[in-house]
Each structure stands twice: as structure tokens, then as C-alpha cells.
Amino acid sequence: MTAEALSLPPREAIRFMLGKVSVGSRRYDDVWKAGHTRAFMVAGVQAGDVLEGVRAALQKAADTGTTLAEFKRDLNPLMERLGWQDKGRRYTAWRTRLVYETNLRSAYAAGAYEQMADPDVVQLVPFWRYRHSGAKDPRPQHRAWDGLVLRHDDAWWTTHYPPNGWGCGCWVEPLTPTDLAGIGKDGPDQAPPIVRRPWRDPVSGRTDQVPVGIDPGWDYNVGQAWRDARDLPDSPVPVPPDWPPAPTPSAPPPLPAQPRQPAPAPVVAPEPPQPPQ
């Protein structure tokens, strides 16, 4: 996937990206969970032309299917002002890929949800199947959830609709009742129990109860959050708190390689029968 553009439902993904307000920040969690559906930010980048330059490169990626390599070239004029090059080539490559994949995968997920959760569509395609990305170094829980089939309105999706963390390429496949029978099921599965673990950020002091298998701050449904934000257009844009900056990782962990995932084909309700002439 590193050399390929993420496959996106263009109209919905573009709308998702365009609907955000640019917000300067020092840390990723300055904006928390569903706040990312309203605020565009890049950790450590303050509001201004540099942030807008990164945003423009990402918007181009959503609009035209820019690959990661092309996105890197688009960011080259900004690298010195971003300050990433000072931390080494590995850090620069890691941050660039992280920004690219995090933003575009979230846009893809929100757009896919918009298609799949349409009231007319869920009448025909009521089941959703969790699909693992096929990463070479998978998270055990994500691999265990692969193939799990639940109704579209199961509460489990409130916290577990992917992506579920940094570098997560998992996705959701819509299924009709006929599709369900084709994979040997006569109904949806039972949702796994949600086990939570305590978490505390050592810098900000923020605490949370995080579902096992999900990274802190990722236990929300980006598609539903996007819908909620549109239903409340006057809700305030999240403002980053005055927290100290996070320490720069000395050896950022490599993201797992992700294969390109095809976008589910848009489901179109059949035309009603025409009366005889």
C-alpha cells in the first residue's frame, strides 16, 4: 500500500476532508476522538501556511488519488519548516506516512459509513463484516475480529468501527442476507464483549478506559461522529488545551505494511417497478 493511493469513495471522502476547520496543535490528542471529524490538525504544527500546505496536499490526495510517494513530493517544499528533516530520514518517512494514512483512512471510513448506513441501503444490506487488513505484523485482536458479522446497528460498531488505531487498515464489508448465506451463516454473530483497560497519558494526565485492541483515542465511530457533527453544525470546533508538547520518539516504530484494500462497491437500491403502459 505504501506506493499506492488508498481506494476512496471520492465524493464522501472529499466532503469529509473539506468540512474540517484547521486547528494548530502540539500533540495529536490535543483534539480527542470524535473531535477529529471537525478539526484538521497535524501534531506539532501550528495554524498557518505550513498547516494549510499539508492540508492542501492531503486534499489533493483525496481528490485525485495521490499516492504516498506523490504526497511526499508535495510536502518537500514544507519539510524544512515542518522540522521533520532535523530528526532524520527515518523519522521523516514515518511522520509523512502516518499523516497520509491516518487522514485518508479516516476519510475513507467516514465515506464508506455514509454509503453503508444510508436508510435505503440498510434495508437491503443490513449486515457488516469486519475485515482485517492482512498486515504482516497484525494486532491479535484485529485478526481475531476478522470475519465477524454484525447488524449495521449493533452497538459494538460505536467503538469498534475501523480504523482502530495507528496504522490500522481494517475495514468493513457490507453484506446482504444472500451474502450471509453464501458464507455459511443464517444470522449475524454475537458481538464480542468489550473489555476495557485503564490508560493515563504521562504528559497531559488525561485518563480513559480504552477497549482492549484499540489505541487510546480511537474508540469511536468516525462515520457516525461525522453524521453527528453535521446534525449539529453550530457545535464548537475543539480547541487544543495548553499541554506541554510530547517528547519526540527517538526511534519511531515502523508502521505495518498494509495491502491495498478495494473500496466496497456503492450499494444502490433497485428502481421501483414501473406501472404498465
What does each model-found stretch correspond to?
Residues 1-165, 175-277:
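Domain-core detector
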Residues 169-173:
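Extended alpha-helical oligomerization segments
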